[in-house]
């Protein structure tokens, strides 16, 4: 018979609480006005808790305790019912993945005025590794996220699906805004309420990846999109090749958004020790409607994507279609 006195009981409870706190690590990724909260328990599944406007420390604690948790990067093979971000064929032919957290690295990029957070994952069985990377710009309300995939298996591993990122959007009166069109009719705004089923925006043209559609979307969370009011999430894939954006709406409480390289006819054989880096997905959030998201994307692009983006420059107006050739006809005399 084991007798435990109050002092020993208090010690055991303290050790248990300490081990729980150490194993259930939460990560906060912030820009000046937005925030992404993740749960990254060592040896467990990385989960997204919240993405939206920046909150207080008290709200963060409350969210971490009560939030609905979604896998931060769902993979194929262990009963996940929705669309997955990553699927592979291992060297032995197996299709199963089960990724768990093995580490977290947070770095301050002083010269770039950004922070870099890397969630390190490893498969439970295979020497297969995925890093989920988050770069939060401190001079623009944009978080870029991408993945870095590698392995140490004896033979090449075939990557069959390799999305850059996954974002769960809570179901409700959510509307999607995106651009579509054709030659001489490009950039037409399409707005629609998200319904059950799959919504896919993709491109397979290679060199004309912005003529019929664009790899940028906005989610209006408060009903029909408004220009200056309402909560909006913006997402833009930073990639000039074939892309695919998927929105999977099933019987649960979420719209499952995934974006990345279009894997159709493009499976990749990843060699041992080779690193496959996916293109970044840029995310932003605004409670000032679509224009608020647009302004944040423009600021981020000027500061970090365009050469000399804040420098005024002359623009050549190409107006030959609007002017028409008849206006250029010389007098016959």
How would you name each of these model-derived features?
Residues 316-325:
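The substrate-binding groove and active-site-proximal loops of carbohydrate-active enzymes
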Residues 97-99, 268-287:
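Short Pro-Gly-centered flexible turn/kink motifs
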Residues 253-261:
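Short, structured beta-strand/loop micro-motifs enriched in basic residues and often containing a Trp
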Residues 25-38, 45-248, 264:
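Polysaccharide-binding surfaces and accessory modules of carbohydrate-active proteins
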Residues 11-20:
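Bacterial N-terminal signal peptides
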């Amino acid at each position: 018979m084991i007798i435990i006195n109050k002092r020993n009981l208090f010690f055991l409870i303290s050790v248990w609480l300490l081990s729980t706190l150490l194993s259930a690590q939460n990560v906060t990724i912030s820009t000046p006005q937005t925030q992404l909260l993740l749960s990254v328990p060592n040896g467990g599944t990385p989960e997204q808790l919240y993405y939206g406007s920046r909150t207080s420390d008290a709200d963060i604690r409350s969210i971490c305790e009560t939030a609905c948790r979604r896998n931060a990067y769902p993979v194929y093979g262990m009963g996940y019912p929705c669309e997955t971000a990553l699927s592979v064929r291992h060297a032995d032919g197996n299709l199963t993945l089960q990724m768990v957290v093995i580490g977290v690295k947070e770095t301050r990029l002083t010269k770039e005025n950004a922070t870099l957070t890397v969630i390190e994952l490893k498969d439970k069985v295979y020497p297969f590794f995925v890093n989920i990377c988050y770069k939060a710009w401190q001079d623009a309300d944009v978080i870029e996220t991408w993945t870095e995939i590698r392995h140490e298996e004896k033979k090449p591993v075939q990557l069959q699906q390799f999305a850059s990122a996954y974002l769960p959007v809570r179901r409700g009166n959510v509307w999607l805004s995106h651009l579509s069109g054709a030659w001489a009719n490009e950039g037409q705004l399409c707005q629609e309420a998200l319904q059950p089923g799959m919504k896919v925006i993709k491109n397979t043209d290679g060199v004309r990846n912005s003529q019929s559609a664009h790899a940028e979307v906005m989610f209006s969370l408060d009903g029909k999109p408004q220009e200056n009011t309402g909560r909006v999430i913006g997402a833009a894939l930073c990639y000039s090749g074939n892309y695919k954006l998927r929105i999977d709406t099933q019987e649960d409480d979420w719209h499952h958004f995934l974006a990345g390289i279009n894997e159709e006819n493009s499976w990749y054989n990843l060699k041992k020790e080779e690193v496959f880096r996916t293109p970044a997905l840029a995310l932003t959030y605004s409670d000032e409607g679509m224009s608020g998201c647009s302004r944040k994307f423009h600021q981020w692009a000027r500061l970090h994507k365009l050469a000399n983006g804040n420098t005024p420059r002359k623009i050549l107006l190409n107006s030959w279609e609007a002017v028409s050739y008849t206006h250029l006809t010389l007098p016959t005399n």
